[in-house]
Amino acid sequence: MRNGLVWLLHPALPGTLRSILGARPPPAKRLCGFPKQTYSTMSNPAIQRIEDQIVKSPEDKREYRGLELANGIKVLLISDPTTDKSSAALDVHIGSLSDPPNIPGLSHFCEHMLFLGTKKYPKENEYSQFLSEHAGSSNAFTSGEHTNYYFDVSHEHLEGALDRFAQFFLCPLLDASCKDREVNAVDSEHEKNVMNDAWRLFQLEKATGNPKHPFSKFGTGNKYTLETRPNQEGIDVREELLKFHSTYYSSNLMAICVLGRESLDDLTNLVVKLFSEVENKNVPLPEFPEHPFQEEHLRQLYKIVPIKDIRNLYVTFPIPDLQQYYKSNPGYYLGHLIGHEGPGSLLSELKSKGWVNTLVGGQKEGARGFMFFIINVDLTEEGLLHVEDIILHMFQYIQKLRAEGPQEWVFQECKDLNAVAFRFKDKERPRGYTSKIAGKLHYYPLNGVLTAEYLLEEFRPDLIDMVLDKLRPENVRVAIVSKSFEGKTDRTEQWYGTQYKQEAIPEDVIQKWQNADLNGKFKLPTKNEFIPTNFEILSLEKDATPYPALIKDTAMSKLWFKQDDKFFLPKACLNFEFFSPFAYVDPLHCNMAYLYLELLKDSLNEYAYAAELAGLSYDLQNTIYGMYLSVKRYNDKQPILLKKITEKMATFEIDKKRFEIIKEAYMRSLNNFRAEQPHQHAMYYLRLLMTEVAWTKDELKEALDDVTLPRLKAFIPQLLSRLHIEALLHGNITKQAALGVMQMVEDTLIEHAHTKPLLPSQLVRYREVQLPDRGWFVYQQRNEVHNNCGIEIYYQTDMQSTSENMFLELFCQIISEPCFNTLRTKEQLGYIVFSGPRRANGIQGLRFIIQSEKPPHYLESRVEAFLITMEKAIEDMTEEAFQKHIQALAIRRLDKPKKLSAECAKYWGEIISQQYNYDRDNIEVAYLKTLTKDDIIRFYQEMLAVDAPRRHKVSVHVLAREMDSCPVVGEFPSQNDINLSEAPPLPQPEVIHNMTEFKRGLPLFPLVKPHINFMAAKL
């Protein structure tokens, strides 16, 4: 696999996305009060340098300008007259590595606190409320060296949003009352991660290096580091926050990216006006020239006990910081070869031995001054017994690379592939794009910031050899992760409690690895035959349609076709659903369908890896209705890959050894569900309760023992014997070619698997349980791993229809920001607080999801109290405020997809739901604009109020591991906080003891009727 890992700490902030669609975008609005100026000729003392020659993709129609402000801020401006959303991001080149040693997590805490009011806009939720009212959203993350803040907003409101945003860096309040509450949010965020193996392993890696190096710090922080210990030591954390912000939030460490409809000159004026006053404290850029892994930290073996039943091997080498060599990228070159998955690769050989299934190789970010090179594999049961041999194979492959020397043709192939990827780059969503660019501005020259991570320029064999020279046994660190080490460890990591044992790797083992000889099985990759060569953009056909058209409708298949008329890139999305009544008929068949496709993908991996490197990807998964197959990106070689996959599906022969290995890995993944987050458990149980047919993890585990190799071999022809295929072919493809592709898929299945069409009566659709009026049901379970509770409260409203969809979505839009502000920011229920629509099988409702240390019945009472406050808030809402919400939702719904795959996903969602409402957004927004405040109040009073006649409610309570029991409902009269709104008295709910009995006792909703007349849809 490809390179690298990224670790982020971020608060999930609320928000809404997307924007109003017009046949033609209105011209960019001028920003008030800014005279038109041409910056190429003018002089402005606030601007030190202007860079208008930004190298961009030939397909990129946006205009770019780089600035360096006099105060040192680097800026990239993007003018896109077609954008629905404007966006901005600011990246401060300071992160958790700069935390004071005695207050771990301070930079992350500072990131949280900046959202909670500024001198100019003191209201705690001013920023989030402004964004919510204008179809916007925001977030931030803290990493070792960066704190990155970003938002998006309806394009008309960039100036208002940017003004509020700029105050974070000019005059934040960092208010003491907010501080005490927000510590809980950081603590809840950490608590969410405590039992997550990825976080645990990351911190353990940091803890086992040089303890005096900033890399060893605990970046997230928690209540102990941000409140308890500082209080004990007489440290005023608010004073430390103010000091941290005033010290490090210096303009010379900041970079900004702004994207809007405005002209570059107007965007320049706006940024100068809002950010030129940020103070330059001339803070030296933190650098870390010493590596955290010194001689005493090398040749060490760490045996680590995970939470989940996983088996992994991590091999790490310290290497110098390669950032300055980005034009030749030696780490990328070596990662490409060591991480290759084709014939003759390291992975191929380790898989053939039955020791591993997957491999990741490449450079991993450290910080300014140091990096790592990693080779990580998962281990089979057999592989766990052969760790020394696996690492020997790694060194044999590295020795092969040394013997062969750097290959210019390999570098050239990487260079060519990256150049094609850059040339035909998809347009990114504004929010992610600005956030990413703001971070890059610290590392690359302004004119090359868009190309730097794509375009390779210089073949530098000397640098490749330099990095290769670091990949030696004397520099190695090895970590093995396995449940088999339980009870055999002698150390505990401080912050996450990870159990581990550290041993020096014996000298004779190091010597054995040093003597690694050439292994004749290893080969360098051959030339990639999947590299696209035909980039022709096909002209639109005469009968091209604005939405997918049904161009084939037979007993065997339905084919929907849409020629791309928006993006004009040499790409296509081919989506297929193979309906089979055998795929989900019982847990045994569900398991067999899963294993068949996992084994199929496993056997295709060597072949398909070259396609993936060449920008051609595929996906293959089992579904409750059968199998899903997609082939995406460059259309040139898609038919070749699709034919190979289809032939393999129809003629597949199972390898016995791979069957045993993949079955065992599947059993572990089923067992590992117990360690998922409490809120994920709540969502899982609700799906089981509400869907007509859904197999539990326990049922699947029990049935897995019955899956034998002969049984699976017999199942495959049964699965393929009768199918109905529904497909969407969308992109740079003609109608004739689409028909040809569909025919090829059908012919292959008929020829090799003797596939026949399904009978119409075999096309089963699962339905949703219909709750009774005024019914309230509670289902309780315990999470055995996490010490947090989780809850999902679901108010089922009705079947999906234009009117019902808009009632629900508008109500969700109105309550979204207040919900987050009330339940998370003010009441501090937990880090994860979510409200929004839930939709399944054509039925919908309002849901709340919370994860908290507080008990579920308390969370339930707070949600009910919040809903009552929202009724009054809507009643008191001005017409202007109500219309803002309608507009925000309309903008979000009409936001144009930024790339072909996103547009295709919308259409595919309509096909999979069998609703086929391809013009849904326009139809529903037209209805939305007719709604009144009274409509929403009526909707609330009829469906959601405590005494509503058509209230239908299910609550799933997931208890923390240390809670033996908990009442399902309770009153909380002794609340200390007088500001809490009063919770209503709740009736006693019906407790669900048996899911099957619960579902048997209730009717099912009918299926939603398709939006379209199939006879009229045919071309």
From Swiss-Prot:
Cofactor descriptive note: Binds 1 zinc ion per subunit.
Keywords, ordered alphabetically: Allosteric enzyme, ATP-binding, Cell membrane, Cytoplasm, Hydrolase, Membrane, Metal-binding, Metalloprotease, Nucleotide-binding, Protease, Secreted, Zinc
Signals that turn on the gene: Expression oscillates diurnally.
EC numbers on record: 3.4.24.56
GO biological process: amyloid-beta clearance; amyloid-beta metabolic process; antigen processing and presentation of endogenous peptide antigen via MHC class I; bradykinin catabolic process; hormone catabolic process; insulin catabolic process; insulin receptor recycling; peptide catabolic process
Reactions performed catalytically: Degradation of insulin, glucagon and other polypeptides. No action on proteins
Cofactor(s) this protein cannot do without: Zn(2+)
Active site per the UniProt annotation: E111
Loss of function: phenotype: No visible phenotype, but mice display impaired degradation of insulin and APP-derived peptides. At 17 to 20 weeks after birth, mutant mice display increased serum insulin levels and decreased glucose tolerance.
Protein name per Swiss-Prot or TrEMBL: Insulin-degrading enzyme
Organism: Mus musculus
Organismal lineage: Eukaryota, Metazoa, Chordata, Craniata, Vertebrata
Gene: Ide
